């Protein structure tokens, strides 16, 4: 098949491109390199089935060839306020790619009679009052808080896809991605796993917000890519699927695991209270994905962390 991956030079997108090439597909990787990196896709450039197009999908453009599937992953995703690549630093670009970019990819999918995959996020649940979160849960969200740039633009992207499915018979599906980690993450991404691993390897303190008892789930990237492909191949038109690892850990537990794996002398440093809008608990209910997609994570947190540490050393 001929497959388009937007955001293909990013963390998840580059892994997805690699997996699709392994499966023998032709891949058109589209990225404006605002937050993605050509280094992430360098290994694919010698593959005759791989084509890279530097393009902002928020702006009008055309894909001349036929297309069977479109994976729309393009969007800044880093919450690191100190990074120039975060959604805080790129508020309007973030909102545009998840609104006009999603609209445009839906139009292209219709014109090409292609399936569309929209990569949404667990952030649409906000600071959830339901635990674990099912796809039917509508969230506890802020429309104007500091995280709303990302959260609300993804919610609107979901609305666009749902409207195209209902009104124009688009073959689209929506996936809500929970915390994912692994090789090719930017070192300044700001999400807790990469921040703790780099701190542990450098012998620096683990910066913990609040008391560290807030919980997260962590999915290794290879599991997530398998889930993404399963959602495209087996997911039903108009459906939403949670993808993530349902095992839950406190931030303090994560710090101790990383300290042990890195052999670090680092200690926890409680730096600030929880940031505004930061959820106390976040964990997916993946019952639907297990039943409908025949998918569930296989890589344990310990195994995944060891892989990431080995990659970074």
What are these regions (language model features)?
Residues 1-180, 222, 307:
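N-terminal Rossmann-like NAD(P)+-binding domain of SDR-like oxidoreductases, especially those catalyzing
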Residues 35-37, 251, 272-288:
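Active-site loop of classical SDR/Rossmann-like NAD(P)-dependent oxidoreductases
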Residues 48, 135-142, 168-169, 196-208, ...:
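A short C-terminal helix-loop "cap" of Rossmann-like NAD(P)-dependent dehydrogenase/epimerase domains
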Residues 129, 155, 170-171, 180-195, ...:
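Glycine/proline-rich active-site loop of Rossmann-fold NAD(P)-dependent oxidoreductases
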Residues 149, 189, 221, 251, ...:
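Amphipathic alpha-helical segment in the mid-to-C-terminal domain
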Residues 250-262, 304-305:
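PAPS/PAP-binding and catalytic site of the sulfotransferase fold
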Residues 301-313:
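Amphipathic terminal alpha-helices
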């Amino acid at each position: 098949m001929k497959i388009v991956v937007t955001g293909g030079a990013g963390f998840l997108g580059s892994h997805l491109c690699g997996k699709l090439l392994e499966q023998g597909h032709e891949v058109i990787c589209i990225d404006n390199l605002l937050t993605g990196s050509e280094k992430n896709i360098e290994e694919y450039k010698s593959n005759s089935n791989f084509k890279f197009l530097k393009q902002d999908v928020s702006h009008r453009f055309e894909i001349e060839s036929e297309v069977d599937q479109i994976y729309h992953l393009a969007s800044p995703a880093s919450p690191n306020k100190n990074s120039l690549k975060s959604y805080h630093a790129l508020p309007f670009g973030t909102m545009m790619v998840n609104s006009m970019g999603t609209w445009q990819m839906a139009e292209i999918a219709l014109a090409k009679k292609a399936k569309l995959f929209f990569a949404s996020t667990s952030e649409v649940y906000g600071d959830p009052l339901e635990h674990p979160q099912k796809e039917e849960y509508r969230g506890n969200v802020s429309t104007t808080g500091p995280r709303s740039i990302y959260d609300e633009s993804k919610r609107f992207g979901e609305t666009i896809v749902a409207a195209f499915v209902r009104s124009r018979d688009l073959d689209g599906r929506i996936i809500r991605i929970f915390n994912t980690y692994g090789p090719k993450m930017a070192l300044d991404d700001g999400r807790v796993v990469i921040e703790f691993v780099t701190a542990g390897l450098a012998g620096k303190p683990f910066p913990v917000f609040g008391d560290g008892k807030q919980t997260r789930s962590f999915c290794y990237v290879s599991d997530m890519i398998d889930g993404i492909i399963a959602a495209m191949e087996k997911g039903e038109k108009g459906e939403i699927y949670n993808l993530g690892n349902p095992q839950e850990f406190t931030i303090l537990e994560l710090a101790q695991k990383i300290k042990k794996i890195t052999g670090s002398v680092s200690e926890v440093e409680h730096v600030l209270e929880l940031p505004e809008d930061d959820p106390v608990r976040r964990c997916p209910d993946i019952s639907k994905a297990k039943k409908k997609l025949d998918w569930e994570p296989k890589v344990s947190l310990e195994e995944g962390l060891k892989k990431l540490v080995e990659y970074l050393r």
